[in-house]
């Protein structure tokens, strides 16, 4: 046995004896693909270059990515080829019809009904879609009519959506957490003739909202048999009439108005066409045919499908051979993962943060906690060396290998044990957290997109060499460029045309030469990889004129094990400050380990000297990475988190900065920023 192997086994044995961890922890795939570099160095690559990215057995040649200086604008621009334009008659219904033709008797959706998991084949689903679509036609739904839809992620969501698409309707999305006022605004903005809600609680909320909705004719509740009633009415509509309606739908027809969750402003209705979703769905499989065409692969849907991200992924899965599992809810996610054992997952960073915090909390503050902390460092160091040098050194690889059977493997099992491609998007992911998951063998890849780009406009294909902090290359069919002020601008067939009934917002969102201005700040490296550096609207300009991007500072503070959220403030203020919230589940064991009252109220914890001292350490660490003018001078710990329930977080788990500032305005004006006498 070699010295390295002997050392590895000795470390494993000692750790197992000390901890007896077994499977106490809850998978990244290994980045060590034979004959393939972990990191594609760009040190000697000129800016003007055409790049055919390296690939492994897990992904195909895909499309050519070109990165160069646009001679017309002088801006660094990167583009990835996509499929040719779709036929004029292509619609979302075709994705389901094609799946049924290819794999009619094989599973398409699996979901939980009561205590049992139910599987629906592609043929069965298509028959369901046609039955509901006929019923909608009977209700008088004409091509181009809007249907407002309020429903949690479920089989009913996919069925209703597909049926509305089949008969040429326009789906106006409502989050299941939206208020009565938001329901009213969406129904009126979309001129919806029908409102479909999932359950009686939503119906009660809707009943209080629709008195001032002149376009609304019917409210249908799924829980009380609404879809069955629609199907029954549909028996009077012939297949020929339905097929005539389906054939009338064109790719350029409006199919949906997706209402943004509004983290910095009032929600806007983004107009989407059949082409937007179909182009996105049919472009990705060209990049990863082995992953998406293998019938053994599965995906678990759990994010809100009212969000464009989750909805686009559903269409991508339908257009592939992947079997789709639908989670029963975020609270049952861990148990649902054990059933679905997904090879693909789409997550927002908050989910990964919760997984990490749960594992850390389970390890505790004793010997297990020491080992878990060491495992985190080992994984992060491994990926840092991979990023810097192309390969990790022998000692770093050995340290990482020692933790795999006792920490990393259990983490992979919690996520189902088969994950090959986990895409994180919707918000920035802490680079340290990404490095941990990737170093631990959990295949987390960052992507980037917006509702206005039909979700993904940049992504890291499976097998992409690790580029620390990058959200990837341009998604097939997209071009990305960086404006002179650092703003990311996007062009492509899947970019939205306008905001519904909002010409002013539309005009402000596009450049004179037709590029969508995202409002996000970033850079593109010589290999065409995009890095997000901040958001223009979040950019803080202090009273002294200093520009501060809050994201990187917030990420560091949130690494404190019991901090849930950090919001950095200071726009037009004399200095930078932060509001910090506590993760109660992580806080209590920390208090106990410090010999403090683990049952103290959150109000007391927010004032506790030891708690404040721990947070101060992370604030200090964040300050080390910025100039003095950008550093956090003062922070306040709040006794409540920012949540959807208190209106401070969107359904896509983004903190709504203006609402937080408004809610705590008195606190900010009297305790954070006191006027000089």
Where are these regions (language model features)?
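Structural core segment of the AMP-binding/adenylate-forming
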Residues: 2-61, 139, 166-232, 614
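ANL superfamily adenylate-forming
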Residues: 24-28, 201-251, 359-410
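Conserved AMP-binding/adenylate-forming core of the ANL superfamily
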Residues: 84, 108-162, 179-184, 231-235, ...
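Conserved pre-ATP/AMP-binding loop-to-beta segment of ANL
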Residues: 104-107, 221, 235-259, 266, ...
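Conserved AMP-binding A3 loop
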Residues: 119-123, 255-281
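Conserved AMP-binding/adenylation subdomain of ANL enzymes
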Residues: 278-298, 305-408, 418
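Conserved ANL (AMP-binding/adenylate-forming) active-site segment centered on the GW(Y/F)…HTG consensus within
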Residues: 465-468, 495-519, 554, 594-606
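Conserved ATP-binding/catalytic segment of the ANL
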Residues: 474-542, 559
């Amino acid at each position: 046995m070699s010295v390295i192997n002997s050392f590895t086994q000795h470390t494993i044995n000692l750790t197992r004896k000390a901890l007896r961890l077994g499977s106490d922890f809850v998978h990244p795939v290994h980045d060590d693909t034979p004959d393939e570099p972990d990191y594609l160095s760009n040190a000697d690559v000129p800016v003007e270059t055409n790049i055919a990215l390296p690939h492994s057995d897990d992904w195909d040649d895909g499309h050519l990515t070109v990165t160069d200086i646009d001679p017309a604008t002088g801006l660094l621009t990167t583009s990835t080829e996509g499929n040719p334009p779709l036929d004029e008659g292509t619609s979302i219904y075709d994705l389901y019809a094609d799946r049924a033709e290819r794999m009619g008797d094989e599973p398409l959706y699996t979901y939980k009904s009561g205590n049992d998991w139910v599987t629906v084949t592609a043929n069965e689903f298509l028959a369901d879609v046609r039955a509901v679509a006929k019923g909608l036609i009977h209700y008088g739904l004409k091509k181009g009519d809007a249907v407002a839809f309020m429903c949690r992620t479920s089989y009913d969501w996919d069925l209703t959506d597909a049926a509305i698409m089949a008969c040429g309707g326009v789906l106006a999305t409502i989050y299941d957490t939206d208020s009565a006022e938001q329901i009213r605004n969406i129904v009126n903005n979309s001129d919806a003739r029908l409102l479909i809600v999932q359950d009686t609680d939503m119906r009660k909320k809707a009943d209080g909202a629709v008195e001032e909705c002149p376009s609304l004719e019917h409210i249908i509740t799924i829980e009380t048999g609404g879809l069955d009633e629609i199907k029954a009415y549909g028996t009077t509509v012939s297949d020929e009439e339905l097929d005539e309606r389906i054939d009338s739908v064109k790719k350029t027809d409006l199919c949906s108005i997706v209402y943004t969750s509004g983290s910095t402003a009032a929600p806007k209705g983004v107009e989407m066409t059949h082409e937007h979703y179909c182009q996105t769905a049919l472009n990705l499989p060209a990049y990863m045919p082995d992953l998406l065409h293998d019938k053994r692969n599965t995906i678990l849907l759990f994010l809100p499908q009212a969000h464009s991200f989750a909805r686009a992924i559903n269409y991508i899965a339908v257009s592939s051979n992947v079997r789709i599992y639908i989670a029963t809810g975020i609270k049952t996610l861990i148990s649902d993962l054990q059933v679905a054992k997904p090879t693909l997952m789409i997550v927002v960073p908050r989910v990964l943060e919760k997984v990490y915090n749960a594992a850390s909390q389970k390890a505790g503050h004793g010997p297990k906690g020491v080992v878990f902390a060491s495992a985190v460092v080992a994984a992060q160091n491994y990926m840092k060396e991979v990023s810097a040098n192309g390969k990790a050194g022998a000692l770093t690889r050995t340290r990482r290998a020692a933790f795999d059977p006792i920490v990393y493997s259990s983490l992979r099992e919690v996520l189902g044990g088969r994950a090959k491609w986990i895409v994180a998007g919707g918000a920035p992911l802490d680079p340290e957290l990404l490095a941990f998951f990737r170093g631990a063998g959990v295949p987390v890849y960052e992507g980037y997109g917006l509702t206005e780009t039909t979700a993904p406009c940049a992504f890291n294909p499976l097998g992409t060499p690790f580029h620390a902090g990058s959200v990837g290359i341009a998604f097939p069919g997209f071009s990305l460029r960086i404006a002179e002020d650092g703003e990311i601008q996007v062009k492509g067939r899947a970019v939205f045309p306008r905001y519904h009934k909002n010409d002013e917002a539309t005009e402000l969102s596009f450049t004179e030469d037709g590029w969508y201005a995202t409002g996000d700040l970033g850079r593109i490296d010589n290999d065409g990889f995009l890095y997000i550096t901040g958001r223009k609207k979040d950019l803080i300009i202090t009273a002294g004129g200093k520009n501060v991007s809050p994201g990187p500072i917030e990420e560091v503070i949130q690494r404190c094990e019991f901090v849930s959220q950090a919001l950095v403030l200071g726009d037009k203020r004399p200095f930078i400050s932060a509001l910090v919230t506590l993760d109660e589940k992580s806080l209590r064991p920390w208090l106990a380990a410090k010999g403090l009252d683990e049952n103290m109220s959150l109000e007391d914890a927010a004032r506790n000297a030891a708690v404040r001292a721990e947070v101060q350490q992370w604030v200090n660490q964040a300050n080390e990475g910025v100039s003095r003018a950008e550093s956090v001078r003062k922070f306040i710990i709040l006794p409540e988190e920012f949540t959807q329930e208190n209106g401070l977080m969107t359904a896509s788990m983004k903190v709504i900065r203006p609402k937080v500032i408004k809610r705590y305005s008195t606190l900010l004006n009297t305790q954070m920023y006191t006027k000089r006498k």
